[in-house]
Design a protein with these regions (language model features):
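Segments forming oxygen-rich coordination pockets for charged ligands
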Residues: 1-197
Length: 197
């Protein structure tokens, strides 16, 4: 299986906008867990899965619309009785899914080149996305890669207090978290060498 970030880098090199759907949180019985990802291309090609079924189809449809608008969204899905009826689903939990649109540009491609190199070297880091707008509505993001030694690839989007928190290993999970720092919102994703589709 090709590592996820290698696949994202390949998609960035194609220069067409695409989306990455990531399960940020899950509660109860769900087909996949937090951190599961799926790349969605404009032609509806997918790489990876967030669990299949109706939720995956709904996420794909939402991603298509978001790609056209160059906007991202965080949305909750409930695998309740209404959604499950007639679908032979046994899950009954809730998912919060980040549907993030990637619009290729040299800076973003450079960040993912550095990230892929980091993973090949077996090192850790943090992919930080600053939300432009508010997470309760559609938004866009700007990214940078942060290493534990405070080296940054990309724009320096992070205020020093947040940089200190990141580098003090306060974010040790395996999936992205939405983090409020004052009035600004960030998505902080710990990077581990084993991230795959």
């Amino acid at each position: 299986m090709e590592p996820l970030n290698n696949q994202i880098l390949d998609c960035l090199k194609q220069r067409d906008p695409f989306a990455v759907a990531t399960i940020m949180t899950h509660k109860g019985s769900t087909p996949r867990t937090s951190g599961s990802k799926m790349i969605v291309l404009k032609d509806r090609t997918i790489y990876g899965t967030i669990g299949g079924g109706l939720v995956e189809a709904l996420v794909m449809d939402a991603c298509m619309k978001l790609i056209d608008k160059h906007q991202s969204r965080i949305k909750e899905f409930s695998l309740d009785k209404e959604l499950k009826d007639g679908l032979d689903m046994v899950c009954g939990g809730n998912l919060t899914i980040l549907m993030e649109v990637f619009v290729p540009d040299p800076g973003l491609t450079g960040i993912f080149k550095a990230l892929v190199s980091l993973e090949k070297e077996g090192k850790k880091g943090f992919l930080v996305s600053k939300i432009d707008g508010f997470s309760k509505s559609d938004f866009s993001t700007r990214k940078c890669l942060v290493l534990p030694d405070t080296t940054i690839t990309g724009q320096p989007l992070i205020p020093k207090p947040l940089m200190d928190e990141i580098c003090d290993n306060l974010f040790t999970g395996t999936f992205p978290v939405l983090y409020n720092h004052g009035l600004e919102e960030y998505i902080i994703e710990p990077i581990h060498p084993s991230d795959t589709l």
